[in-house]
């Protein structure tokens, strides 16, 4: 339940508007509300980090509005809370009126939801399930450079789950569509909320089964097999892609060293 922020309120401050995050001096604000001119603002506590409250304030600031990607190097738990705040702020902003009857909606007092004041329809934040998979072939990993990441970073394959599709089917389809190969021995590893814009990454490992690499040029700039001890530029630590790569490298080292 939201409330008005008072002078002595303190904690982490997620000030967000239109999927942007307020980052004075390039950092997520932490401390007393008065230090950041937040007294009197309406805020919602969205969690705790190391015993301190994490507050969401839906507000546009004139300066220092940036992407949540800028705080990706934070501790994983705090980064996830920042991402939660950005996603919730966008959810509340985009659900002011009911999609069924057009009447005004209001936030639930018991959960993250918006309720229609007329037809009683209930809306929840959208979450888009995605798969991400590290594929191994003997002592090598399949890594690709995506068209949307023209910075030299090579990563594992990923994609959105389609309607009526299992996670396993999504892995097989995405891998075939993007690289032209088939995989086998699929194994679930972990998951990670990913606020770009509202994904839930489900991470897998798989083994190469058959086929030659034929990339989808709309998705990939290039893809290739890289030996575990001779890898290109990788995604940053803290990402689920980096974990999948490091876990696969560890398995290769155990077998080949």
Curated annotation (Swiss-Prot):
Gene3D superfamilies linked to this entry: 3.90.79.20, Nucleoside Triphosphate Pyrophosphohydrolase
Motif placement: Nudix box: 159-180
Cofactor stoichiometry and binding remark: Divalent metal cations. Mg(2+) or Mn(2+).
Cofactor: Mg(2+); Mn(2+); Zn(2+)
Highest taxon of the lineage: Bacteria
Residues reported to bind a divalent metal cation 2: 174
GO MF annotations, alphabetized: magnesium ion binding; manganese ion binding; NAD+ diphosphatase activity; NADH pyrophosphatase activity; RNA NAD-cap (NMN-forming) hydrolase activity; zinc ion binding
Residues binding a divalent metal cation 1, per UniProt: 158, 178, 219
Binding site for substrate: 25, 69, 111, 124, 192-199, 241
TM region(s), chain numbering: none
UniProt binding sites for Zn(2+): 98, 101, 116, 119
Chain positions recorded as a divalent metal cation 3 binding sites: 174, 178, 219
Keyword Zinc belongs to the record: yes
Top-level class of the enzyme under EC nomenclature: hydrolase
GO biological process: NAD catabolic process; NADH metabolic process; NADP catabolic process
Keywords: Hydrolase, Magnesium, Manganese, Metal-binding, NAD, Zinc
Residue ranges annotated for the Nudix hydrolase domain, each copy included: 125-248
CC terms in the record's Gene Ontology section: cytosol
UniProt subunit comment: Homodimer.
Functional note: mRNA decapping enzyme that specifically removes the nicotinamide adenine dinucleotide (NAD) cap from a subset of mRNAs by hydrolyzing the diphosphate linkage to produce nicotinamide mononucleotide (NMN) and 5' monophosphate mRNA. The NAD-cap is present at the 5'-end of some mRNAs and stabilizes RNA against 5'-processing. Has preference for mRNAs with a 5'-end purine. Catalyzes the hydrolysis of a broad range of dinucleotide pyrophosphates.
Family of this protein: Belongs to the Nudix hydrolase family. NudC subfamily.
Protein name: NAD-capped RNA hydrolase NudC
Gene name per UniProt: nudC
């Amino acid at each position: 339940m939201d409330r008005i922020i008072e002078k002595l309120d303190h904690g982490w401050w997620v000030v967000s508007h239109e999927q942007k995050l307020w980052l004075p001096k390039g950092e997520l604000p932490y401390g007393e509300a008065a230090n950041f001119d937040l007294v009197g603002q309406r805020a919602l506590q969205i969690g705790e980090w190391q015993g301190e409250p994490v507050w969401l304030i839906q507000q546009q600031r004139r300066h220092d509005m940036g992407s949540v990607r800028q705080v990706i190097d934070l501790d994983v738990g705090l980064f996830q809370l920042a991402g939660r705040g950005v996603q919730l702020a966008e959810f509340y902003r985009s659900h002011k009126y009911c999609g069924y009857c057009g009447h005004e909606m209001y936030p639930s007092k018991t959960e993250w939801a918006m309720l229609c004041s007329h037809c009683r329809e209930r809306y929840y934040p959208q979450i888009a399930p995605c798969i991400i998979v590290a594929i191994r072939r003997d002592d090598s990993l399949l890594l690709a450079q995506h068209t949307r990441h023209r910075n030299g970073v090579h990563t594992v394959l990923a994609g959105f789950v389609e309607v009526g599709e299992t996670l396993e089917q999504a892995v097989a389809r995405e891998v075939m569509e993007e690289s032209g190969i088939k995989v086998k021995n699929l194994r679930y590893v972990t998951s990670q909320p990913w606020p770009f814009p509202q994904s839930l990454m489900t991470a897998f490992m798989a083994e190469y089964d058959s086929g030659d690499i034929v990339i989808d040029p709309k998705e990939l700039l290039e893809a290739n097999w890289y030996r575990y001890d001779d890898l290109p530029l990788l995604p940053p630590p803290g990402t689920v892609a980096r974990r999948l790569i490091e876990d696969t490298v560890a398995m290769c080292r155990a077998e080949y060293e």
